[in-house]
């Protein structure tokens, strides 16, 4: 699963998911992509599950680009722990996604196959997505 090798700070603030994506909202590498329509914290597990689904569908044909990276750590306290005593340890990693952000790009795959791959991939994501082309 994806996670950064090192970060400047171990435990970032939560922040808020307001507005639409101003960066990462256009196709750069491939001719077709999967675009997020809702804001979310996308976990590294969800990104990996989606990647596996797409690669299983297209097999060795074409090229896939992952346009998101989980660079924000989410901390959590152990269960049945009393409040206080500082912030919990980093539990997992997320990518902050705003509406309009391109999640995956693909190229060199037939129309039927890429539609099927992105359709099956969208079931692995907890948000609404849109299939876009150049």
From Swiss-Prot:
Q: Which UniProt keywords apply?
A: Chloroplast, Plastid, Ribonucleoprotein, Ribosomal protein
Top-level taxon of origin: Eukaryota
Subcellular location(s) per record: Plastid, Chloroplast
| GO terms under biological process | mitochondrial translation
Pfam family name, one = Ribosomal_L16
Chloroplast: present as a keyword of the record?
yes
Gene Ontology MF term list: rRNA binding; structural constituent of ribosome
Which family, according to UniProt?
Belongs to the universal ribosomal protein uL16 family.
Identification of the protein by name: Large ribosomal subunit protein uL16c
Question: What organism does the record attribute this protein to?
Answer: Guillardia theta (Cryptophyte)
What lineage, starting at the top, does this entry show? Eukaryota, Cryptophyceae, Pyrenomonadales, Geminigeraceae, Guillardia
Q: Which gene encodes it?
A: rpl16
